[in-house]
């Protein structure tokens, strides 16, 4: 680890507190002991970044110096399955030198992260954003949960699809973009890639209660893993055909994985979600191989259909 990165990590996390947080047995995690995707591999290092330059979700909100619920869960998963996690909200960590110390970057973020708004934590610089995208294209893994698609929005109207060349470079990388969401509700995830890591034991799909994002601007090369089943869902945001909710894609040499799940705190300890997440992590860091050909036209052929724009009352 570089001296620059090491000193920053020491500044961000008090080691005595880290030992307490990393032993968070009181979380009641629904760990999947049969999911062994990290054995016989070098210990991977993941940067979990959760700055909010906009709405801050309760699952990533810290209480003083105490780590957030999602941070604790990811750290505990790492401890159990054999990967290291550095959790921060400090955008100054994004430099070319610092990113060399990680195998993957995990975003649970909102807004324009170069702006010092929202949670008031130090923002990423413009150069830091460039360094992030360069690192991914050069081979670093990237993972995004929930509001990672509500980050660095593309210019243009909310209820219109933007051409690829007009999408923000970050949106081009992650492969989709948030429009809006309806009320929290139980909804069905349909498995579109049964052989993707972490998905094998989920059968044809599962149901889970969460806040569900309506998404647009899908990359044409998405390998769709889970599909949002919209039939029966409450809210005009879901008056559209089924669309991708979890996917994988390559960005240059980098492996990109995203799931729209993760708003609710109880989702983070749900065994199905953890199975999906661990499979995505293992693939993104290169521990496991998986065929990820584009399949969006088969898995969700009408995904680009935008829901109706709400009428003003």
What is each PLM-predicted segment?
Residues 41, 168, 172, 176-252:
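Catalytic beta-strand/loop cores that center a nucleophilic Ser/Cys/Thr
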Residues 42-43, 70, 80, 233-243, ...:
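Extracellular ligand-binding/catalytic regions of CAZymes and related secreted enzymes
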Residues 47-50, 86-87, 104-109, 141-145, ...:
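Structural recognition of the beta-strand scaffold that forms the well-ordered cores
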Residues 52-55, 91-94, 111-114, 142, ...:
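Solvent-exposed loop/turn segments at secondary-structure junctions
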Residues 112-201:
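A glycine-rich, often tryptophan-bearing local segment used as a flexible ligand/cofactor-contacting loop or short
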């Amino acid at each position: 680890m570089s001296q620059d990165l090491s000193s920053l990590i020491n500044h961000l996390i008090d080691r005595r507190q880290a030992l307490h947080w990393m032993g968070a047995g009181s979380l009641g995690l629904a760990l999947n002991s049969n999911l062994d995707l990290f054995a016989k591999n070098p210990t991977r290092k993941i940067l979990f970044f959760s700055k909010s330059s906009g709405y801050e979700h309760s699952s990533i909100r810290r209480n003083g110096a105490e780590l957030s619920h999602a941070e604790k869960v990811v750290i505990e998963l790492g401890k159990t399955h054999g990967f290291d996690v550095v959790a921060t909200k400090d955008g100054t960590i994004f430099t070319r030198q610092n990113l060399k110390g990680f195998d993957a970057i995990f975003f649970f973020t909102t807004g324009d992260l170069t702006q010092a708004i929202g949670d008031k934590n130090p923002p990423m610089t413009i150069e830091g954003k460039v360094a992030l995208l360069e690192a991914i294209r050069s081979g670093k893994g990237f993972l995004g949960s929930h509001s990672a698609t509500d980050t660095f929005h593309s210019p243009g109207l909310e209820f219109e699809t933007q051409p690829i060349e007009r999408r923000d470079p970050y949106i081009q990388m992650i492969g989709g973009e948030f429009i809006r969401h309806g009320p929290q509700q139980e909804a069905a995830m349909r498995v579109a890639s049964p052989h993707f890591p972490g998905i094998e034991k989920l059968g044809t799909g599962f149901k889970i209660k969460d806040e569900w994002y309506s998404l647009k601007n899908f990359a044409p090369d998405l390998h769709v893993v889970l599909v949002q089943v919209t039939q029966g869902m409450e809210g005009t945001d879901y008056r559209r055909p089924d669309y991708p909710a979890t996917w994988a894609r390559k960005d240059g040499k980098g492996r990109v994985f995203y799931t729209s799940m993760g708003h609710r705190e109880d989702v983070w300890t749900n065994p199905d979600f953890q199975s999906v997440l661990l499979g995505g992590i293992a693939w993104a860091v290169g521990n496991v191989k998986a065929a990820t050909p584009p399949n969006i036209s088969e898995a969700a052929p009408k995904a680009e259909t935008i829901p109706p724009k709400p009428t003003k009352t």
